[in-house]
Amino acid sequence: RAPCMPHRFPCTASRATRPPMILRPATLEDTAALAELGRESFCAAFEHLYRPEDLHAFLAQAYSQEAVAGEIADDCCIHRLAWSDAGEDGGENGSARLLGYVKLRHPSWYTEHSDAADPIALGQLYTQPDLTGRGIGAALMDWALAEARGRGHDAIQLSVWSGNFGAQKFYQRYGFAKIADIGFWVGEQRDDELLYEKRL
């Protein structure tokens, strides 16, 4: 498998009730937490779309600890993690909890679909399923846009499932617009995806 593969991500929501959080880069010590959140978030949003064997194959490919560790170590991938303060939306015994994360990738997988000179891809934007609507995704999106601009990229690209209308509206509010129709494979099932881009 090619490192730092593209992934679909579910819709995230408003800033209204954003919990206290710390944004920081990923380290290899975060591998297990990232793999678990990736699986849980993807399944919460999309599990019903797939045959069990296709879903199992995709999760093994994309969210095994080996795959996630490879992406953390890959210089092409840039992760930013949102961790709770201990005791604030935390884990057991008041420990800190991984609330969500975003992953950027350069070079983008989608350069052939755009005339942008140096686009970057937003490959994952995941939050804990029980914290949807708390503004965590918005905070991570704000970080991703600022990071892309700070690195001098002229566009940021992402793919979204054609049937995920809530996510499409979320991205459109940030100024993303469709530039192409593409495919996304989960096991042996191909889904219709929309490629979105925002010029920076």
Residue ranges and their predicted role:
Residues P6-A32:
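Conserved N-terminal entry element of GNAT/NAT acetyltransferase domains
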